[in-house]
Amino acid sequence: MGVWAATQVMGKLQETDTALVIKNSIAINGTPYPIDDTYGIPTAIYHGTLEGLTGPSLHKFLRRMCFNGEAFKEFLNITPRRPLEELKEELAEIERMYLSLPAASFYWQQAVVGNNDRIIPPDNQLNAWRKEAEISRKTLRVHYTEDAHYQVELFRYYLQEIWTKD
């Protein structure tokens, strides 16, 4: 949901501060359409996750975010522990906001799509970025990786090697 949230925030910032210059924007394993059968997480899967959220199902979801068992263990060491009710409320609120807010007009220059993403189907991500390129009529570079939805090496690369380089 981070790409959608960033799209909303950055779109608002650009509306209010016309002098704001974004040199580079990279969406990683997400889309501006968080709940969508073609461009995001399929609606039935999202609702199934929300309605069936339990301790064991959350554990399974978090495991699916990671590439393998070792990556999952590392992820568990850094992820915050939150009450299930709080997570359910957040998921319900994300859907409410997604359905009620106008589409943001933020333009992503690059997108990273992990072929091993088991949260947002890679084909849906590709569909979303094709749609965004058509809407904006701008070039959008899509990078294909073999990464999972969350992969520490991927984020480390983009945060340390790319983002801090300039």
Label each residue range with its predicted role.
Residues 31-34, 67, 115:
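Short, flexible active-site-adjacent loop segments at beta-strand->alpha-helix junctions, enriched
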Residues 11-52, 90-93:
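Flexible "cap/lid" loop of the alpha/beta hydrolase fold
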Residues 107-109, 121-131:
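Short alpha-helix in the alpha/beta-hydrolase fold that links the catalytic acid
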Residues 95-105:
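The feature captures the conserved acid-bearing segment of alpha/beta-hydrolase catalytic domains
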Residues 134-166:
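Catalytic active-site module of serine/aspartate enzymes centered on a nucleophile-bearing elbow/loop
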Residues 1-6:
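Gly/Ala-rich beta-loop-alpha elbow adjacent to hydrolase catalytic centers
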Residues 111-113, 117:
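Short beta-strand/loop motif that positions the catalytic acidic residue
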Residues 38, 52-95:
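Conserved alpha/beta-hydrolase catalytic His-Asp/Glu region
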